[in-house]
Amino acid sequence: MLITINNSHYEIIAEHGDGFNEEAFKSRFSEILNRYDYILGDWGYGQLRLKGFFDDQNQKASYDNKISTIKEYLYEYCNFGCSYFILRKIKK
């Protein structure tokens, strides 16, 4: 599935528990997320949270913001068993 927002295109690369809701994603999306290569959306207490991650090859990214740390982030900061999704930005 292709998602377009603010002239950027994303594809869903992972989804757990029917986590993706396009309407909720578009209403929570902030322009600051445009700079990231990946966006994680997770649900907690009926609220969608969005967090950006960079590609591992991005030398300016801190360790915690690299996509290879996303499983650790899910374990540490998300509710156990929560619904979530991961989007990857499609570069032209």
Segments the model singles out, each with a brief description of its role:
Residues 1-44:
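N-terminal leader/targeting segments and the first structural element of proteins
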Residues 19, 23, 60-65:
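Ordered, soluble secondary-structure elements with a strong preference for glycine-centered loop motifs
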Residues 62-92:
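Helix-rich interaction surfaces within compact, conserved domain-sized segments
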Residues 11-13, 51, 86-88:
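Residues in well-ordered beta-strands of folded domains
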Residues 34, 41-58:
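N-terminal interaction modules that seed assembly of large macromolecular complexes
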